[in-house]
């Protein structure tokens, strides 16, 4: 196994990104069957950090940031074969570093709730979500 290298930038082969999402289980919660939407998600992210094992994409963080106050970490994915090696922790560290003084905020996948306290996150009790299909719905 070679050393993991890290890069910043969103100029990535979409097929590699989709394949990574599939192999990390994040694909279960992302529109990987909609290439145009996935491309838009990738290109409009203001901060993307990737992890590479030689030429294989093994991890990614995809964030939206103002680089001053808030960085929303939209996606954290690490290939299942490469988990439990500190790659996720390092991707988060590099995302935080690149985000300047911004606070990193995320919504956890249900199966990852126990992970985030181990990498320095504290749970916030008053987060709210408004999905696109509920906008303006008064129910």
What is each residue range found by the language model?
Residues 31-32, 36-76:
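A conserved beta-strand-loop-helix scaffold within acyl/acetyltransferase catalytic domains
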Residues 105-107, 117, 122-139:
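Conserved catalytic-core motifs of GNAT/GCN5-like acyltransferases
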Residues 78, 84-97:
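Conserved acetyl-CoA-binding loop-helix of GNAT-fold acetyltransferases
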Residues 9, 79, 109:
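Residue-level recognition of the GNAT/N-acetyltransferase active site
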């Amino acid at each position: 196994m070679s050393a993991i290298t890290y890069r910043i930038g969103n100029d990535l082969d979409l097929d590699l990104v989709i394949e990574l999402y599939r192999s990390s289980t994040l694909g279960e919660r992302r529109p990987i069957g909609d290439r145009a939407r996935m491309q838009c998600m990738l290109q409009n992210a203001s901060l993307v950090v990737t992890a590479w094992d030689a030429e294989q994409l093994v991890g990614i963080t995809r964030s939206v940031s103002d680089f001053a106050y808030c960085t929303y970490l939209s996606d954290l994915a690490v290939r299942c074969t490469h988990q439990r090696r500190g790659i996720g922790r390092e991707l988060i560290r590099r995302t935080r570093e690149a985000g300047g003084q911004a606070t990193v905020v995320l919504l956890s996948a249900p199966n990852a709730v126990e992970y985030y306290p181990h990498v320095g996150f504290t749970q916030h009790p008053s987060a709210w979500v408004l999905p696109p299909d509920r906008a303006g719905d008064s129910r």
